[in-house]
């Protein structure tokens, strides 16, 4: 008989999640198609069948969530003329850490004449979770890009309240080798108190950043502002021949956030619209 108790478990190390997913897309025979696919560990990529339009890829973390010491890496590259919409099967969950941080690293590359939409569903942080998230984007001149990252601190409908957590979010976006957008966002360890500050979130527990880079991003400015309303903001910059549209949204919970984020994504993503998995 094997007896298990705290004494003989204390020396054991827990199995960690490690996942890597890599996808390359090419434009061939009038369609955007897979040119390379690599999957390792908990990272899986599935492509619903599409006859026309951009290639759609759904990213899956088969572990169901991340905690301290877990690692997840995504790498997406588009060759000349290709288009793709990348989303996730479900919200990513970051659970309480027993030590160390969970890490999510994403690298996106888009060649000339491509259109890339990075549209993962929300990342949910639970109490005492620790997350380091990194996004690196390389765009060639003439590439178009739409990026959405939404973060939720606890699920209000489930009675969850995040008091303590750590969250670091780092973005670097380059166009033609030049940095056109950079972010270093950090919260914690007293997240509950920090979110109450008027200069941070004013008591909101859900937030999103939307970034669009294309030649005509300015045409969406006024409509985007109308969708956002008072709880957020929208700005426009010229970056060389292209323009950059940046949107910030905040809301009391994920449901209220989605009520504005979904029509905004549908607007900015053109004919591709909102990913179907967002509505399931």
UniProtKB/Swiss-Prot annotation:
Any one GO MF annotation of this record: nickel cation binding
Keyword Cytoplasm (UniProt): yes
Coiled coil: none
Any Pfam family: UreD
Matching HAMAP family: UreD
Function in brief: Required for maturation of urease via the functional incorporation of the urease nickel metallocenter. Disruption of the ure1 gene cluster suggests that it protects brucellae during their passage through the stomach. The major route of infection in human brucellosis is oral.
Protein's name according to its UniProt entry: Urease accessory protein UreD 1
């Amino acid at each position: 008989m094997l007896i298990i108790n705290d004494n003989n478990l204390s020396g054991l190390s827990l199995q960690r999640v490690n996942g890597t997913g890599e996808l390359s897309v090419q434009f061939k025979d009038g369609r955007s198609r897979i040119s390379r696919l690599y999957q390792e560990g908990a990272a899986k990529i599935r492509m619903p069948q599409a006859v026309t339009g951009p290639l759609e890829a759904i990213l899956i973390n088969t572990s169901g969530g991340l905690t301290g010491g877990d690692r997840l890496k995504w790498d997406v590259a588009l060759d000349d003329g290709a288009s793709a919409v990348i989303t996730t099967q479900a919200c990513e969950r970051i659970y309480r850490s027993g030590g160390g941080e969970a890490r999510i690293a994403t690298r996106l590359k888009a060649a000339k004449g491509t259109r890339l939409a990075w549209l993962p569903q929300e990342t949910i942080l639970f109490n005492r979770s620790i997350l380091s998230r990194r996004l690196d984007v390389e765009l060639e001149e003439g590439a178009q890009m739409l990026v959405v990252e939404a973060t939720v601190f606890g699920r209000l409908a489930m009675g969850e309240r995040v008091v303590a957590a750590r969250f670091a979010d780092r973005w670097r976006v380059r166009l033609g080798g030049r940095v056109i957008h950079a972010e270093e966002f950090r919260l914690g360890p007293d997240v509950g108190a920090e979110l109450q500050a008027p200069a941070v979130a004013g008591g909101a527990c859900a937030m999103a950043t939307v970034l669009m880079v294309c030649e005509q991003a300015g045409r969406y400015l006024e409509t985007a502002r109308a969708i956002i309303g008072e709880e957020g903001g929208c700005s426009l910059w010229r970056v060389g021949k292209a323009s950059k549209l940046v949107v910030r949204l905040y809301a009391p919970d994920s449901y209220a956030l989605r009520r504005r984020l979904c029509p905004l994504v549908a607007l900015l993503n053109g004919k591709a619209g909102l990913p179907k998995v967002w509505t399931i």
